[in-house]
């Protein structure tokens, strides 16, 4: 456990990334290839910026990232725009009616020592993020989101499957073994009429 944490923590520092979470996105991208070089991406819960940093440095050659978070972000890049605020107060007009090719989120709620409470808070946050994603994702866009595993996961996956051609559960090697975090990769968004 600790060795894995130390390895990814050190690797992030060596590669000048803001957080070890970057390797979770890197693993998912290597597996699913869901972000293309020209994509416009919305990064929800983007602070401290490692997802955005990775996408702009390694994948997006002409694309851009808009990051949103309730916490300030110190990451800067010419193709990165940061919006400070709560996603529950946002809609497509927040982004000047721009639609995104991909929405990613490594956001997590405030946690407690109770795993079940953490799961329910995570599902609630994910549903709020998904509500925003439904407004801002392009047809056939992709959605990648962190969630804490638990008893409401299957219901949430079922909700997602109504809007996407496929929903895959992904547990990165860079996640801590004891962590209940998993990611859902949702491919090819379809707007329900």
From Swiss-Prot:
Classification via InterPro entries = RNA_methyltr_RlmE, RNA_MeTrfase_FtsJ_dom, rRNA-MeTfrase_E, SAM-dependent_MTases_sf
Question: Does Cell division show up as a keyword for this record?
Answer: no
Show the GO MF annotations.
rRNA (uridine-2'-O-)-methyltransferase activity
Name the active site residues.
Answer: 146 (proton acceptor)
What function does this protein fulfil?
A: Specifically methylates the uridine in position 2552 of 23S rRNA at the 2'-O position of the ribose in the fully assembled 50S ribosomal subunit.
* Family, similarity comment: Belongs to the class I-like SAM-binding methyltransferase superfamily. RNA methyltransferase RlmE family.
Protein name from the UniProt record: Ribosomal RNA large subunit methyltransferase E
The organism is Brachyspira hyodysenteriae (strain ATCC 49526 / WA1)
